[in-house]
């Protein structure tokens, strides 16, 4: 299965996977408006491959069922909460 990957011109770290190059017909208009102008990244063969950020089986299923897959960046880590947790652990260890 081939797949073309595009990055968003509006949302950093957001990628759109589609089964046919430059065919955005299955992608909802509202999503395309939020995504901005798609910037081509690459076309890859998904079979027998691993992807760094997403589960390849989810990508394949979404491409077959929905006609696209949207990869969004993970939420930013809350450093303040992490610091508070570490301080609480240090207090408990004393």
UniProtKB/Swiss-Prot annotation:
Taxonomic superkingdom: Bacteria
InterPro entries, A to Z: YcgL-like_sf, YcgL_dom
Pfam families (UniProt xref): YcgL
SUPFAM superfamilies for this protein: YcgL-like
Domain YcgL intervals: 1-84
Protein name, as recorded: YcgL domain-containing protein VP0875
Species: Vibrio parahaemolyticus serotype O3:K6 (strain RIMD 2210633)
